[in-house]
Amino acid sequence: MINAQEISALLKQQIEGFQPDFDYTETGVVTYIGDGIARAQGLDNAMSGELLVFENGTIGMAQNLETNDVGIIILGQFTDIREGSVVRRTGKIMEVPVGSALIGRVINPLGQPVDGLGEIRTSKTRPIEYPAPGVMQRKSVNEPLQTGLKAIDALVPIGRGQRELIIGDRQTGKTSVAIDAILNQKGQDMICIYVAIGQKESTVRTQVETLRQYGALDYTIVVTASASQPSPLLFLAPYAGVAMAEEFMYEGKHVLIVYDDLSKQAVAYRELSLLLRRPPGREAYPGDVFYLHSRLLERSAKVSDELGGGSITALPFIETQAGDISAYIATNVISITDGQIFLKDDLFNSGIRPAIDAGSSVSRVGGSAQIKAMKKVAGTLRIDLASYRELEAFTQFGSDLDAATQAKLNRGRRTVEVLKQPLHKPLPVEKQVLILYALTNGFLDSVPIDDILAFEEELYAYFDLHYDGLLDVIRTTKDLPDTDELNAAIQAFKDQSVFK
C-alpha cells in the first residue's frame, strides 16, 4: 500500500526530471514566386548562402538578406511552390559529396548522379564556398602539366597549380583543347574534373563518351548543369566542382579542373541578380561579378608541403564575340588568371588546329615549370613564329626576297605545320621534344610542307623501334640526350626514308 507522501515524492521527482521535448525551427512564408526566385518573410535570422527547405521538399538558398524579406534562389523545380507556402531554415550552408567514389561519375551541381549508375556511396561532404589558401600556404608552381599539345607545351607551358584561361569565339576548338589535356593525364597520377556549364545535353553526352572511349573516365568526374537547368544550378556548378577538387588537393593529390565555360556562369549570375533586384553595373552585370570569378579561381593553387603539397590546375573558358578580348568578363578573367591561350577563328578556318594565336597567348608562371629539354628546343620558337607572321604579311606586297628572308619564311611555314595536331591525339613530351629538335636544327628544311605530317609519324615509329633509349633519356632525365647522338639518329632516319 503506497501512502500519500510516497505518491507526492514520486510526482515531485518526475516533475523535476521532466525534459521538454520540442523542435525549434524558424519558418517563413513565401510572398513572391517566379523565374526560379522566391521571396519570404519571417526568416529574420537566415544566413547568407544558407539552405532553406520549402514544404514540398524543394531546396532553396538565401541570397538577398533585406529588411523585410529574404531573396531565395530555388535549386530545382518550383512549380509546386505558391504564395503562402511555408519555408524553413536548415542552419546549414550548401555542401556537396566529395571523395574518390565520385570518380568516373556524371553528377549535377548538387552532387546527385545523372548517369543512371545508382547512388554515390560516400559519407564525406565539403562546403561549396571555402576560403582560398593563404599566401604562406602556397608554393610556387614548379611541376609541369603536360597537355600533350605541342603548341601549348612549347609556347604557353602550364604548371601544376596554375590558372590558364582558354579564350576564343565559339567553334574555335576550346573544348577540344581541354579534352585532349584530360586524355593526356592518363598514367600521370592526376584527377580531372570537367565542369560543363550551360552546354547542350547532347554535347555533354558526346564529351562523356569520348572520355569513356579513351579510358579517361577512370580518373575524371563530370559535373554538368545543362542549358535546360535553372540558372541557380549554372551559377553553382563551378563551386561544386572546385569543392570536389579541394578534397583531393588537401589529400596531397593533383587535380586538373576545366570550367566550360565561365561566360555562361556570369550570364546566369546576371540573370539571378537582376531578378533579385540587385543594382546592375556595366553590361548589366552586378557589381560583384569580378568577385564571382576571383573567389572561384583563387582556390586553384599549389599548396605547401605542410598541407600535403597537392595542387589544383584550372583551365577556365571564356567565349568572346568576334574576337573581342576587351569585353568586361574577358578582361576580368584575364586579370585573375596566370596567362591565357587565345584561339582565333581565322586560324581555325584555315586548318591550323589547335588554332592558337602565339602572339596573344602567354603563360606567366608555366615557364618555370617547363622541362629542360623543352626549354632548349622551344626557347626561340615564339619569337621565330612572331617574326614569320610579320614577314608573311610583308610578302603580300610581292617584293623580291633575299635568301635569309626566304629561309625564315620556309622555317616559319614548317613551324606552323609541325604545331598542328589531330584531334584526340595528345603526344608524350619526349616525342614533342624530338620533332621540335628536328625542326629547330634544320632537319625539316628540305621536307616538303605537305609531307611533314607523314615525316612526323614515321620519325616517331622509327625512334620507337631503333632509338627508344634516346626517348627514354628525355623521359627520365627531362633533358636532351647527347646532341651528336641525336643528330646522327635523326639523320639515319632521313637517309633510310623517302624524305631525303
From Swiss-Prot:
GO terms for molecular function: ADP binding; ATP binding; proton-transporting ATP synthase activity, rotational mechanism. Its EC number is 7.1.2.2. It is a peripheral membrane protein. Keywords: ATP synthesis, ATP-binding, Cell membrane, CF(1), Hydrogen ion transport, Ion transport, Membrane, Nucleotide-binding, Translocase, Transport. It comes from the Bacteria. GO terms for cellular component: plasma membrane; proton-transporting ATP synthase complex. F-type ATPases have 2 components, CF(1) - the catalytic core - and CF(0) - the membrane proton channel. CF(1) has five subunits: alpha(3), beta(3), gamma(1), delta(1), epsilon(1). CF(0) has three main subunits: a(1), b(2) and c(9-12). The alpha and beta chains form an alternating ring which encloses part of the gamma chain. CF(1) is attached to CF(0) by a central stalk formed by the gamma and epsilon chains, while a peripheral stalk is formed by the delta and b chains. Produces ATP from ADP in the presence of a proton gradient across the membrane. The alpha chain is a regulatory subunit. HAMAP family: ATP_synth_alpha_bact. This is ATP synthase subunit alpha.
